[in-house]
Amino acid sequence: MIGKRKEEHIRIAENEDVSSFHNFWDDISLMHEADPEVNYDEIDTSVDFLGKKLKFPMIISSMTGGAEIAKNINRNLAVAAERFGIGMGVGSMRAAIVDRSIEDTYSVINESHVPLKIANIGAPQLVRQDKDAVSNRDIAYIYDLIKADFLAVHFNFLQEMVQPEGDRNSKGVIDRIKDLSGSFNIIAKETGSGFSRRTAERLIDAGVKAIEVSGVSGTTFAAVEYYRARKENNLEKMRIGETFWNWGIPSPASVYYCSDLAPVIGSGGLRNGLDLAKAIAMGATAGGFARSLLKDADTDPEMLMKNIELIQREFRVALFLTGNKNVYELKFTKKVIVDPLRSWLEAK
């Protein structure tokens, strides 16, 4: 059941329009410097993310696992992560807890030397739903399965509200994270709706080490689940998916809200190296890419490598044209921000 759902998610993300109405990264412009006074060849793109050295401030965000087609996708993504010295997460690992026979769709990434690996479990699975919550032993199993450096706890309650089989209880999630944070390095990850400052503060107080914002600008899982509901002719869930298609906090605003609290992965709608530079300029430590890499990871590994290479090149060009010789300096680059994003920033 879970594997079938994950395969449906992959196919919908590859073949349907599941983007939010507006990409808020387009509301940001970085100040151009006609004379950068920088040697392009000396630009340093490396960053330290909570003690892990990345050659480039990019993380392949959690996407998939638990379905047979996911094994090849994760293998290709891991090869790319090793080659470019970037981080990588896998999709929700609940499927491996339920069915150990598909654990290789996740552990395949151990064939490559990925400098930063992120395991993944859903916040809804941390508390009792119609089934028992996952145990600490279950969490240790998935963490060890990929030799993880961090555990992403993904918050997908909008998706759960649209999903025909969705979970409805969030009471107790913070307490469970407090319990787990003593044993695991936790990253709180949204899945398309972003984090408010209020929620981020509660998560940091509970022991979360970093936040991946994944806000409005990119894939919306309300849309993904809308297409699943349409296939099943579930009119109620289709209606909810349409109504909440664009629900949430813009990705750049969520970065701005959270970046003085903890290291932030700016994700949700990043398309290229310039978007990545904007994420860093808004306060992120690194940027997360997902859907823009998915199809190539599935069907064309060579194009996947080329795509990441171009993202890297675009990012270096953005550093050069803003007069910055390293990633840290980019955080202080002057920005011009217009509405509708500007209004969201004022809501902090």
Curated annotation (Swiss-Prot):
Top enzyme class: isomerase
GO biological process, one term: isoprenoid biosynthetic process
InterPro entries assigned: Aldolase_TIM, FMN-dep_DH, IPdP_isomerase
Localisation: Cytoplasm
Residues noted as binding Mg(2+) in the record, renumbered to the chain: E160
Main location group: cytoplasm
Positions bound to FMN: S61, S62, M63, T64, S92, N120, K189, S214, T219, G269, L270, R271, A290, R291
NCBIfam families to which the protein is assigned, alphabetical: IPP_isom_2
Quaternary data: Homooctamer. Dimer of tetramers.
Name of the protein described by the UniProt record: Isopentenyl-diphosphate delta-isomerase
Annotated source species: Thermoplasma acidophilum (strain ATCC 25905 / DSM 1728 / JCM 9062 / NBRC 15155 / AMRC-C165)
